Amino acid sequence: MAVERKFIAEGARKARVEKYLTKELKRAGFGGMDIARTPLGTQVTIFAEKPGIVIGKGGKLVHQLTQDLAQNYGVESPQIEVQQVQNPSFNAQIMAERLANALERGWYFRKAGSSIMRRVMDSGALGCEVVIAGKLTGARARTQKFTEGYIKHCGEPSNTIVEKGYAIAIKKLGVIGVQVKIVPADAKMPDHFAIIEQEKKLPAPKTTVTAVIETDNEEPALPDENIDEEV
């Protein structure tokens, strides 16, 4: 059971770190993170829409994040690397945060959800799903779903090719949860394959071979009549 508990503890710590970074880097457009163990310590890669805000003036903010990860979350020798998100429309976490901010500013949930989905699909995504749950229009909580394109919900493709993001919008009536799933344009589908047609070979031209056979069976020459008469 020691091995199982170790994996559970690692997963719980990663969830706490991600929650902390989401809260601290909300203005920077936090788009997710990745943690990997290296011989020199722990490599923490932060994906953000605005890397300059993550680094801070003179590297002050990134230094503070490094100290917090080491002291409060038990990350061994953290080394933070910041990477800019090239296409924010394909980052599910960034789009979920934008949708939550739109709901907090008073956007109607149908308009906000369809606007986010349309922006993702116009960027060339293969599929997008937006789920908004909470007290949307009345006292009762309900769920509204917007879907377009191709989305996998189970199996290995749902974990490998589907980008997932989650955010919370705090309103007067209560909390509204937002979930965004995106299948990027460069995702490789498991059922997509190409059939390579074999090149048709032209038939070889027919050649006619004419054989000339020489034989020794020649007709004997007839005797000359003049010779017989002279004799």
Swiss-Prot record:
Annotated keywords: Ribonucleoprotein, Ribosomal protein, RNA-binding, rRNA-binding
Pfam families linked: KH_2, Ribosomal_S3_C
CDD domains the record matches: KH-II_30S_S3_arch
Signal peptide: none
Example of a GO cellular component annotation carried by this entry: cytosolic small ribosomal subunit
Domain of life: Archaea
Bridged cysteine pairs (disulfide): none
InterPro entries tied to this protein: KH_dom, KH_dom-like_a/b, KH_dom_type_2, KH_sf_prok-type, Ribosomal_S3_C_sf, Ribosomal_uS3_arc, Ribosomal_uS3_C, Ribosomal_uS3_euk/arc
GO terms, molecular function: rRNA binding; structural constituent of ribosome
Subunit comment: Part of the 30S ribosomal subunit.
PANTHER family: 30S/40S RIBOSOMAL PROTEIN S3 (PTHR11760), SMALL RIBOSOMAL SUBUNIT PROTEIN US3 (PTHR11760:SF32)
Name of protein: Small ribosomal subunit protein uS3
Organism: Methanoregula boonei (strain DSM 21154 / JCM 14090 / 6A8)
Gene from which this protein is expressed: rps3
